[in-house]
């Protein structure tokens, strides 16, 4: 199996977030799965080709406590037309194509209160175009 690598869409989004929030907390950031992820299906686990299709951002993006919700919500709305995005989880809610990108209660093990989880589709493996999100433009 090839070495794990974050999909191009994930790399681009991470770079955009880092530029928009250079002093943000990164303690809950991550992309490649740890041992708890490897025991179950997770987009943090590499595909057979080595692609990791998930990235987490610490919820403390800035001094504004609403910034993480605004970011997650803008991603959710963008995902209606950007097929690289698979789903978003934050603060006990999940949005995906299956629910027409409406927030619903997330019932998984981790409510994602300390970080925003974004999963990507296969289209994101090599498509690293920038994401058109107002919060990332300053």
Give the role of each language-model region.
Residues 1-100, 113-120:
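Secreted/periplasmic proteins that engage bacterial cell-wall peptidoglycan
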Residues 103:
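Glycine-rich catalytic cores of cysteine/serine-nucleophile enzymes that process amide/ester linkages
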Residues 106-138:
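Active-site or metal-binding loop neighborhoods of secreted/extracellular toxin and effector enzymes
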